């Protein structure tokens, strides 16, 4: 029952940056976000980018998000500098008035200009959204994986309606096993 109006990530989940995070290797885990309101920010609920220790088991439900200054609803950001395994993200019953960019954004190429050792490919798996409505955004789902499709997989959006999507579509690259079941964008059923 909290309201977030931060101008940055409304809720930011982290587990350490680069070598420090890998040294400790303790994932953030078992977080429930329920009955919250998110307004201005880079993302409503965000995992990363300092997520080198990993993350598992996020439950987000019954939340409202709405602002022309809210960039994304659910955001996962990491890179080959950070690494980490991010898994088991469950989101349901979310009402969004508007967001600037995308309802779901997964980005494995965050801050690609950072000078670092890039031998730590991250994995994002088991991310599931159900019963999410959004009345305005630029895209529905935006996934920026790596050059292959082995690091982002088992992603689903189900029983959801995204209206007034400016680009009228999703933009998914570098991912496999993406399921869109009963997802409507601008009133049209999205074919898998």
Feature map (PLM): residue ranges:
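Extracellular/periplasmic carbohydrate-active domains that bind, remodel
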Residues: 1-192
């Amino acid at each position: 029952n909290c309201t977030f109006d931060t101008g940055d990530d409304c809720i930011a989940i982290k587990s350490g940056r680069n070598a420090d995070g890998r040294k400790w290797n303790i994932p953030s885990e078992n977080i429930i976000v329920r009955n919250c309101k998110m307004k201005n920010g880079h993302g409503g609920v965000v995992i990363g980018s300092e997520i080198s220790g990993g993350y598992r088991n996020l439950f987000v439900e019954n939340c409202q998000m709405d602002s022309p200054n809210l960039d994304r609803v659910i955001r996962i950001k990491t890179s080959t500098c950070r690494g980490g395994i991010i898994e088991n993200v469950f989101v349901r019953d979310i009402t969004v008035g508007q967001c600037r960019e995308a309802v779901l954004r997964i980005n494995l190429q965050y801050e690609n200009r950072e000078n670092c050792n890039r031998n730590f490919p991250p994995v994002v798996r088991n991310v599931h959204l159900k019963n999410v409505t959004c009345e305005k955004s630029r895209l529905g789902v935006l996934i920026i994986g790596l050059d292959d499709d082995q690091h982002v997989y088992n992603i689903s959006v189900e029983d959801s309606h995204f209206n007034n999507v400016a680009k009228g579509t999703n933009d998914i690259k570098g991912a496999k096993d993406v399921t869109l079941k009963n997802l409507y964008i601008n009133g049209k059923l999205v074919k898998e």
